[in-house]
Amino acid sequence: HVKLLVRQFLRRANTTSQPWFLYVGFHDPHRCGHTQPQYGAFCERFGSGEPGMGSIPDWQPWYYQWDEVQLPYHIQDTEPARRDVAAQYTTMSRLDQGVALVLKEIEMAGHADDTLIIYTSDNGIPFPSGRTNLYDPGMREPLIVVSPDPKARRNEASGAMVSLLDIMPTMLDWYNVSTPDKEMTNDIRFWDNDNPKSFLPVLEKEPTPSADDAVFASQTHHEVTMYFPMRAVRTRKYKLIHNLNYGMPFPVDQDLYVSPTFQ
């Protein structure tokens, strides 16, 4: 169980004065209907307490009516697609409750007031034009940051342009570790032009928007058989996607291909 593993880690961390880093990954809300169809398209029935589904003690399932869910703009308005989205929303609620358990463990270990918490995802929504694409639905990921710094803003949404590339320099900044010198890196360009950079300053003050604001993205293969290299740059006004091998057929991920939405 994730919460027990987190508890075990924090107990070890409390035996030393050294700073620690904990990465917790959840399967939710990934698809799993292509490998475990008995649990539903997103394994939304797994652990629900239904006959044959097992039970997750800390999870109270939330269900959504397929004809009432709000659809993202890029998903077709059909009953199969709506049922697909409703199933994912159920697993999102399971994820939400799982994150709450992790936060509770951090609090119980006495680290609620000295831990920087970053919540995000690894890719966009697994629907058409989403994951494995560099269209906006494929790049949009949640980013919630909670800082114990008393100077940090609370309960505010930011318009700062950041990407997951910024997490590493942010963590180095948090630990007061200097970023590598250019001559020490394999790719000197990685540290040029302040990109990526720490977003800790954003937690204290909203940056002034600039025409030079930009984030970068890349996609090469989601699976070893899904090679289709793409690169993208997004500014506040424009976006450019460069398909490096545009003449080849675009590969569709297996779990998306067999999904109710795609079929």
Spans of features found by a protein language model:
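Active-site-proximal cap/lid insertion segments
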Residues: 9-168, 172-193, 219, 232, ...
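Two-component system phosphotransfer/interaction surface
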Residues: 169-172, 199-200, 204
